[in-house]
Amino acid sequence: MCQQILRDCILLIHHLCINRKKVSLVMLGPAYNHTMETPASFLLVGIPGLQSSHLWLAISLSAMYIIALLGNTIIVTAIWMDSTRHEPMYCFLCVLAAVDIVMASSVVPKMVSIFCSGDSSISFSACFTQMFFVHLATAVETGLLLTMAFDRYVAICKPLHYKRILTPQVMLGMSMAITIRAIIAITPLSWMVSHLPFCGSNVVVHSYCEHIALARLACADPVPSSLYSLIGSSLMVGSDVAFIAASYILILKAVFGLSSKTAQLKALSTCGSHVGVMALYYLPGMASIYAAWLGQDVVPLHTQVLLADLYVIIPATLNPIIYGMRTKQLRERIWSYLMHVLFDHSNLGS
């Protein structure tokens, strides 16, 4: 979601200031499969200019996807099976792991299929379903980062009232609110783009059905959907970042008000995992934004697409590792769970 903000702005400038036909020729190259009606399917190019490296990319993405699935599944299972881990922080982490699974599974299997076998075809409905779930997952994740920041604020600034403020009902309400907010924000965008007339090329210069890449194929002016995405993304991400920043300002103020250095370090260490996850979410998005802003003359198109591809898999791969390494209790619970599964199965087998 956050990486759409400047991309949409760039697309708006292109369509308002430059002849649209020229833009289409620059972005899409020679004409492909021109039809006069909505195509039954789209063709995903993959990473243009890196076709010779597609096999190695498929191997790397497959490895990261397996790590992401295993890591996030273990976290969800370990937290779900341990009643002592049903605290707000662990519940939000469980939801984050589930969102990461949805994000990676929406994109990576098809991407690997394109890179390995060249199976680039994706049906019209599947393409927009993929786009919906990718944007939905990113919108939910930014909301989760906000709720986790609020959790850290209450834990550090109001520790005596922690369980009274973050009750199970409050946690459920917050989780439902960020999910409903994401659905309300993303559904109109998906509807607007899917109802654009696609009477020209059906070749998507991307590895998955990304909003901007699809909007460029439309015969009608895609500015309304791009403007909606720009305003919606700005409001959602901007407000989330503002509240996260406010939470951490209050957290730092409370931490540095402690007299003991040991207490200060202990308090800050409880925020380390959350800060790491935020960095994985926002920094790759910023890199993708700046790459789009600089344009193909500075950042080649294949680099822009590669950055967008990595953005959907790297956070899902590294988030479980960050929380597993930084959270001692969770690490011990995961290790205990793995030993239980491995040794109990081996004992049953013998």
Swiss-Prot record:
**Topology within the bilayer:** Multi-pass membrane protein
Extracellular face: residue ranges? 1-55, 106-129, 191-226, 289-304
What positions does the record give for glycosylation?
N33
**Ranges of the Cytoplasmic topological domain:** 77-84, 151-169, 248-267, 326-350
* Cellular component, GO, one term: plasma membrane
User: Which cysteines are disulphide-bonded?
Assistant: C127-C219
Record's keyword terms, sorted: Cell membrane, Disulfide bond, G-protein coupled receptor, Glycoprotein, Membrane, Olfaction, Receptor, Sensory transduction, Transducer, Transmembrane, Transmembrane helix
- Location of this chain's protein in the cell: Cell membrane
Bilayer-crossing residues are: 56-76, 85-105, 130-150, 170-190, 227-247, 268-288, 305-325
**A molecular-function term among this protein's GO annotations:** olfactory receptor activity
Its biological purpose is as follows: Odorant receptor.
Per the record, the similarity remark reads: Belongs to the G-protein coupled receptor 1 family.
This chain belongs to which protein, by name?
Olfactory receptor 52I2
Q: Which organism is it from?
A: Homo sapiens
